Every structure is written in C-alpha cells, then in structure tokens.
Amino acid sequence: MYSKYPAFFLNKNIKSSSGVQFSNVVKIPSAIESLYRGDNNLTGIIFLLPTLITGVFCQNFPEVVDIEQIRLHKLTNLSNDFHMVSMSEDPQIALDWGNGCFITIDPVSFSDYIVDVHATFSENQLNLPGRMEREKEHVALAVPFCSIKKITIHNKELANPFYLSIPQENHEAKMELNTLYGELISLLRKKYTQEVDEKEEQIALRTYAIRYLDFYAKFCGCDNPFDKTIAQLSELYPEFMSNFLQSSHFSSKTGLMKEIVVNSLDNLFKEHPYTKSIDASYIYRVKESTTCYEDDWAKPVYD
C-alpha cells in the first residue's frame, strides 16, 4: 500500500468536473489574476512542440481531488508520485523554486480546476508549518498552455505567443476549455495508469488536439498564432521562437503552425519527456512516499 489514508467514498460533497472530481477543497479566489510556477527544468519542457498542446502537467491524476490528495502532494517529499502542478501567488517564491526560471499563469480560464492549498488545509481544520504558509500555494493537475502569459528565464521575460486571454464573463470560452481540460486529464490518466493500444491513443490524441486548435480558431480570431507561419511568429516573438526552434523537432518548418502541429500529432506522447518512457514497469510500480504521518519534518503539525 502506498497510502495509509482511509478509502474515500463518494458523497454529496463531491463536485464533478469532466475528467476530475473535487471534494472538500477550496478553489482559487476569483480576485487572483496571476499565479507563478517555478521549475528548474523549465527550458527543457516549455518550448517543446508537444507542450503547446498538452500544457504543463503532473504525473499523478487522481479521479477525486480531496484533502487526502492535497496532503499527499504537500507533505510527501521522496518522489513525484503524488505531486501536482504547484503554483504560487508570489513570484519570488516561484523564482526560488525554479532557480530563476518560472512561468506567469492566468488562472481565470481554468479556475474550476485550481485548488487553494492553504485555504483547503484551513477548511479541514489543519495547519501548515510556517515555512509552508509563506509559499501561498495553489495546485492543479495541469496548466493549459493557452493560460501561460509569459516565461521568465534568468531575468529575461519572453511573451507567450500562444497565450489566450479569456475574461471572467466569457462563460462560453471557459466552458469549452473546461471540456478540453477534462479530456486532457482523462488522456493523461489513462496513459499513466493503463497499458494502452498505441493506435487508439493516437486517435484520441489527434481528436483532442484538433478540438484544441478549433478552440483557438473560435476565440482568437485574426490573432490566432496557429494561423501564422514560423517566419511570421519569429518576427513577432523572436526570443520565444528561437528557443522553440532549438528545442522542438518536426519534419517540416513550412506552412501554418496548425499544419505543423497536425502533422506531428502522432508523436505527442512519444516525444514528451514525461510520457515517452512510460511502460508496464512504470505503470505497475510500487509508489514510494513519506506521508505526513511518517515525515519528521511535517509530523509535528499533527501531533
């Protein structure tokens, strides 16, 4: 057993979203306009072609996100087996987490999927150590690439050409992105927990990605970055595209970005660093963890 927590039974407190459910957690306040995620391997992930479609995601996809999952994320230190995508309200925290590298995130478009860690602990009559309180942390299972405003690499800010600003009042866009988000989480959960048929996976990925491109076409209008060529994007966003072209691999650089993406869809999971090496031994491994009941660093909170 990798968790000592009691089994969770579905009840009326569960609020369902496609792809993931939430129970007894507190979502991000609507007043927060930006979150920040630090990652010391940011440059190895953020400029990859697959990341344009999958965004930034974790390696743990519970069907129900509740206080037990938040505990495992926050107070488990030995592996990434239970970690979600961490974000902070404080850019300095993200700067420290990422050793100078972080992304600035617009949480509005996927706020239904973001959990306020500290408010959730308080709601469940739990306290965090002071050193954790300072982190002002929020978590999600994934961050859509369209919600990333900019990328900071050692004091240099790069605008994200694929950022799509969605106002709070644009309920149609938020609902469509929610549907896409749920589809992505379901795809990732299946990838991480089941041995999948490669052909079926490719079809599902292609279906999701084309719907994602259609989402841009519907809500970007004439500013849709996927309707531009690499040359056009390089002229508008030279630093981002320079990193993108160095990091990504595709057979042809001609045509519109959406055509380049569609031609690369069969390799999305094959080329992503997180998913390319997943096999049966990984799926059925025994997860390693030090929980809050065993970790001397965290245990005093519960004594």
Curated annotation (Swiss-Prot):
GO terms for molecular function: glycosyltransferase activity; nucleotidyltransferase activity. It is an enzyme of class 2 (transferase). Disulfide bonds: none annotated. Disruption phenotype: Deletion of the gene has no effect on bacterial replication in the amoeba A.castellani. The keyword Thylakoid does not apply. Optimum pH is 6.0. Keywords: Glycosyltransferase, NAD, Nucleotidyltransferase, Secreted, Transferase, Virulence. Its EC number is 2.4.2.31. The keyword Iron does not apply. GO terms for cellular component: extracellular region. Its main location: secreted. Changing residue 137 to A: Loss of activity. It catalyses: L-arginyl-[protein] + NAD(+) = N(omega)-(ADP-D-ribosyl)-L-arginyl-[protein] + nicotinamide + H(+). It is found in: Secreted. ADP-ribosyltransferase that targets a specific class of NAD(+)-dependent glutamate dehydrogenase (GDH) enzymes found in fungi and protists, including many natural hosts of Legionella. Acts by targeting a conserved arginine residue in the NAD(+)-binding pocket of GDH, thereby blocking oxidative deamination of glutamate. Lart1 may target amoeba GDH to prevent a conserved stress response. In vitro, acts on Glud2 from the amoeba Dictyostelium discoideum (DdGluD2) and yeast Gdh2p but does not act on human or Legionella GDH homologs. This is NAD(+)--arginine ADP-ribosyltransferase Lart1. The lineage of its organism: Bacteria, Pseudomonadati, Pseudomonadota, Gammaproteobacteria, Legionellales. The gene is Lart1.
